[in-house]
């Protein structure tokens, strides 16, 4: 929605509206243009704009000031959508014959801004500067965040079991997760997976085994029975993913797949991502799943899950190349496939969601990913 004052020439306001709309269109957003609003006495333009917006499923309302405008005309529209995040965007003047010409956009935004704050709106303030390019990066950052927030409200995560190994950091609180972030977490029992194994189509199993053998790189020979077992688990879990529409999934790992089925689920996770395009985490890490979803919605990229193992004073130390697996033993388990794929190096963003004192917070940092020295986790066959 673009706003201007009734005494400003409508042609100039329309021109500024069209330019701003063009910038947003060029950035690739799915837009609804509610038009130009002025402070006419009977709020005809304001009410028309509000009506255009009615029923549109929006993640963000862009409130664009093309010039000074009395705040009451703006609130006439925005207060009907106070539950929607807003981007308050002040345009700017221009230079003509060596003079600055302005429609006093920031006179409008600096009055609107404290009112929005007083009314409790959730908004971001961005403004243009004469002679500078449009603040596209700031516009995109906020609108993308709003889109991610909206997507989370429809997101569902599946968890086989709960609190693997009695871990603390993987727990979640369902009401706050749904209320504050919007994510619905749906548990299901390992027994569902086990019973689904007998319902699988032999052709699908054979196709899965063929895919693994032809596309994965094996560091040493592997018994086909191990591959078939992993494919069957993935297809059985996939039935539930398809049925419930999950976008991310986490499994009962150590106390479930390893302890009860004697099968570390590394290859199962790889296949679930391949077949069903879901994000995956081990060990009932629901918070890890939600972290992945947030970062995926913000970046548009698949978000891998990694763990910390060591810190170094000077850090010398997603896959790069084919999926690489190694038949290996771990502890009491004598048959399993260990994922030993190479991880891409370069600039990375690392993130983790946490719930503390009734609020969610995200720890985010960037770094340079480098190839680590040779290493393996104690307990696995050497080398692993």
Mark where each language-model region is.
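Metallocofactor- and cofactor-centric catalytic cores in central/energy metabolism, strongly enriched
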Residues: 1-113, 117-149, 154-158, 163-248
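Anaerobic metallocofactor- and corrinoid-dependent redox/one-carbon enzyme cores
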Residues: 11-19, 67, 85, 90-92, ...
């Amino acid at each position: 929605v673009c706003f201007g004052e009734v005494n400003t020439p409508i042609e100039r306001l329309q021109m500024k509206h069209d330019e701003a709309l063009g910038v947003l269109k060029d950035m690739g957003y799915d837009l609804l243009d509610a038009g130009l609003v002025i402070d006419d006495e009977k709020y005809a333009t304001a009410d028309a704009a509000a009506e255009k917006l009615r029923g549109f499923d929006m993640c963000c309302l862009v409130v664009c000031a093309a010039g000074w405008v009395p705040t009451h005309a703006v609130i006439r529209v925005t207060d009907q959508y106070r539950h929607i995040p807003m981007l308050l965007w002040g345009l700017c003047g221009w230079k003509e014959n060596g003079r600055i010409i302005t429609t006093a956009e920031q006179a409008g935004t600096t009055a609107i801004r404290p009112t929005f704050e007083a009314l409790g709106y959730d908004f971001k303030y961005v403004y243009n500067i004469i002679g500078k390019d449009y603040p596209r990066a700031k516009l995109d950052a906020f609108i993308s965040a709003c889109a991610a927030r909206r997507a989370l409200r429809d997101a569902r995560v599946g968890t086989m079991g709960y609190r693997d190994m009695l871990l603390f950091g993987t727990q979640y609180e369902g009401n706050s997760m749904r209320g504050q972030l919007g994510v619905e977490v749906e548990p299901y029992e390992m027994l569902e997976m086990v019973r689904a194994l007998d319902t699988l189509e032999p052709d699908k199993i054979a196709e899965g085994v063929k895919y693994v053998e032809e596309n994965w790189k094996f560091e040493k020979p592997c018994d086909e029975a191990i591959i078939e077992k992993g494919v069957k688990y993935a297809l059985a879990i996939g039935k539930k993913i398809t049925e419930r529409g999950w976008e991310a999934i986490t499994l009962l790992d150590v106390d479930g797949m390893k302890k009860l089925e004697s099968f570390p689920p590394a290859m199962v996770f790889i296949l679930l991502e391949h077949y069903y395009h879901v994000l995956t985490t081990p060990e009932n890490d629901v918070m890890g799943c939600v972290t992945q979803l947030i970062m995926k919605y913000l970046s548009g990229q698949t978000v891998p899950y990694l763990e910390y193992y060591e810190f170094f004073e000077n850090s010398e130390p997603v896959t790069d190349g084919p999926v690489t697996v190694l038949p290996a033993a771990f502890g009491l388990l004598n048959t399993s496939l260990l994922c030993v794929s190479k991880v891409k190096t370069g600039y990375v963003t690392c993130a983790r969601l946490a719930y503390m004192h009734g609020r969610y917070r995200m720890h985010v940092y960037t770094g340079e990913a480098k190839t680590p020295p040779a290493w393996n986790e104690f307990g696995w066959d050497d080398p692993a």
